[in-house]
């Protein structure tokens, strides 16, 4: 069947986003998402484009984003509304601050990946007495520190997220 597409150009900051709409009901018009707005606010507030995730596991969706101006950091949370949670923290002035972690879980594995010449340290944990898993990744890019934490996300999925990071 013939479909008619309408092309829309959105300007988001200095980036252009092209969306397509269709007269067919099974194709939904794309719009600027809350997630994109959070990334744009980070850019506007702190003056840089943060590393972005271009892959999420199935059913994982953006939940909320918070910018802490005084602490010079931002946090973005994704969830599948069941038991999978992904927390992404961006620390602009990490030399003068720290991200505190109190991990009492058992460290199972530690390894390093290199994505676009950026070393990423990954630690895998078993959550005590629950059988659930927890994975942390930490890396630095252009003097910004990034921390990605996942609960109940499979190792392969977590690493796929990392392999699909977009560095600006």
Language-model features and meaning:
Residues 3, 37-41, 157-160:
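Exposed alpha-helical structural elements
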Residues 4, 35, 48, 162-164:
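Generic low-polarity alpha-helical segments
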């Amino acid at each position: 069947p013939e479909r008619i597409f309408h092309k829309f150009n959105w300007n988001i900051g200095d980036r252009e986003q092209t969306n397509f709409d269709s007269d067919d009901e099974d194709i939904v018009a794309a719009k600027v998402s809350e997630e994109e707005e959070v990334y744009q606010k980070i850019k506007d507030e702190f003056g840089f484009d943060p590393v972005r995730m271009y892959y999420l596991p199935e059913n994982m969706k953006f939940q909320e984003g918070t910018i802490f101006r005084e602490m010079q950091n931002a946090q973005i949370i994704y969830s599948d509304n069941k038991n999978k949670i992904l927390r992404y923290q961006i620390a602009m002035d990490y030399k003068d601050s720290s991200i505190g972690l109190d991990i009492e879980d058992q460290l199972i594995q530690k390894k390093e990946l290199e994505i676009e010449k950026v070393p990423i340290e990954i630690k895998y944990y078993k959550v005590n007495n629950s059988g659930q898993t927890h994975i942390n990744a930490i890396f630095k890019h252009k003097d910004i520190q990034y921390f990605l934490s996942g609960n109940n996300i499979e190792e392969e999925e977590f690493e796929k997220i990392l392999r699909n990071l977009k560095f600006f």
